[in-house]
Amino acid sequence: MDKKSLSEILNALGNEHSLTIMAVLARSECYVSELAKEVGISRPLLYLHLKKLENAGLVESEIRHFEEPPYTKKFYKAKDFQLTLSLSMIKELIKTED
């Protein structure tokens, strides 16, 4: 992992809403309206968090089409990951980039 990737992951997870989103998506995939309702935030705010989480590689999305309205829904699901962080790891990341 490089410094940029670690920063993206920590930035994406560095918020209570993002952690709640990850917990909900760890249980099951959700579409946006359903997820916003469960997390208790507006859809625009949810999209901001989802974008950060997706850019960090922590969630993925899929658009599905239906025969009845709404005809398309964007579903999100958590990607499995493990993060180990230590002071020595951070020191090594910085040293390798100098």
Language-model features: locations:
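Pre-recognition alpha-helix immediately N-terminal to the DNA-recognition helix
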Residues: 19-23
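Short, Lys/Arg-enriched N-terminal segment that forms or immediately precedes the first helix
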Residues: 1-10
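Beta-hairpin "wing" of winged helix-turn-helix
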Residues: 56-70
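Key DNA-contact positions within bacterial/archaeal DNA-binding proteins
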Residues: 44
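Short helix-coil-helix linker/hinge
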Residues: 11-17
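Conserved segment of winged-helix/HTH DNA-binding domains
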Residues: 67-98
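Short capping segments at the starts of secondary-structure elements
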Residues: 16, 27-34
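Alpha-helical residues within the helix-turn-helix
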Residues: 37, 54-55
